[in-house]
UniProtKB/Swiss-Prot annotation:
Spans annotated as G1: 26-33
Subunit structure as annotated in this protein's UniProt entry: Heterodimer composed of CysD, the smaller subunit, and CysN.
tr-type G domain: residues covered: 17-232
Pathway in which the depicted protein is active: Sulfur metabolism; hydrogen sulfide biosynthesis; sulfite from sulfate: step 1/3
Coiled-coil regions listed in the entry: none
Annotated protein name in UniProt: Sulfate adenylyltransferase subunit 1
Similarity section: Belongs to the TRAFAC class translation factor GTPase superfamily. Classic translation factor GTPase family. CysN/NodQ subfamily.
Pfam families, per the entry: GTP-eEF1A_C, GTP_EFTU
Function as written in the Swiss-Prot or TrEMBL entry: With CysD forms the ATP sulfurylase (ATPS) that catalyzes the adenylation of sulfate producing adenosine 5'-phosphosulfate (APS) and diphosphate, the first enzymatic step in sulfur assimilation pathway. APS synthesis involves the formation of a high-energy phosphoric-sulfuric acid anhydride bond driven by GTP hydrolysis by CysN coupled to ATP hydrolysis by CysD.
Documented EC number(s): 2.7.7.4
Enzyme class: transferase
Amino acid sequence: MADKLDIKAFLDKDEQKDLLRLLTAGSVDDGKSTLIGRLLFDSKKLYEDQLDALERDSKRLGNAGEHIDYALLLDGLKAEREQGITIDVAYRYFSTNNRKFIIADTPGHEQYTRNMITGGSTANLAIILVDARMGVITQTRRHTFLVSLLGIKHVVLAVNKMDLVDFSEERFNEIVAEYKKFVAPLGIPDVTCIPLSALDGDNVVDKSERTPWYEGLSLLDFLETVHIDSDNNFSDFRFPVQYVLRPNLDFRGFCGKVASGIIRKGDKVMALPSGKVSHVKSIVTFDGELDYAFPPQSVTLTLEDEIDVSRGEMLVHPDNLPVVDRNFEAMLVWMDEEPMDINKSFFIKQTTNVSRTRIDSIKYKVDVNTMEHSSVPFLSLNEIARVVFTTAKELFFDPYRKNKSCGSFILIDPITNNTSAVGMIIDRVEKKDMNIADDFPVLNLPELGIAPEHYEAIEKAVKSLSEQGFEVRIEK
């Protein structure tokens, strides 16, 4: 009985640990997979059968000579092992006494930029590896730019293979100075630099005696203690409605995930786009009612008044509204094998909202290696650009730098259903500055000879179309 209680206590404690999502990025052979493998190995997070398989595979496929090749723990695809590179995003989970971790090992090659964007989309922290012999190279700059684009606020520059430069403090300081000079204009608020050797384990889990001049934490100690709670936006309440729950006539609740901000029982809320106002009656979860909710909790809100709210709409505080607009510009990462057709319309999915959208213009493409801007007529796979959009119906958004959940979106090809691109909203664009015709369809009911008693039925049909992403405006 005591053993069972101990197990339950352990599971309860593990459940209460906070979670750090991190990604690793770096050039080919900088040692990303080796570093994560070493982290798992030295923190005693591998089972005996995994260790046995690792030793066998190291002899057969390894690239570490007489050493165990820790990279094989993460390079799961056959092509990756044969080429000694990472192609897909490899996820690994482990926990320590202080924190739980999900690691995304992302590919370093430019042709797999979309894989890195996918792996880093939910990350709190990025580990960017550089080879101590090579220093800051083009790929280092590219990965850092992508990390800044994703809004990741914590970056660890892991200067790996310090054993190959005799753990030189001078060499480490040269690399740090060059990197910090490059990263300063990108606006990443927290950059930490750590000298290490992934193969030998120096400064990975424990401080190394071979770097007496380094006064900082080991990598694992830093990951356990880095403060990420303040990264969440607790100021701007945004609740995209995912589903309207009505199990019986006495209950009507709005289900969704709190994207940002805090909501309490009794708070005044406004439904967008209708502008109707009510108060929160209850905050319901599977485990019972709450007095308040915060991101990223999934809850059901009930309101004091019967107001019409559907999937894709949003509940907010009336004195703190998002941008409500159809015109905006964003940084777009093209992820489709097919090049962009700028004359084609797409579905845009932003929070739970879906609409038709068109691409009005490409302001410039960013060369991710040199940071130079250039004018282009379209985008190809893995290319990044600043793009202007017009949507068929209004979206409710915040700039991505302020609110990741409400400032990000995907473009969906309406024919293939492929995810064509991901985007990070910069801000609204004033229509007067666009000089672009508004060519979405308009139904002028009086001109069509439709009697007023039929207006309500037509409005319901148009609303149904709107929920599917087809916007038709009505004029009465």
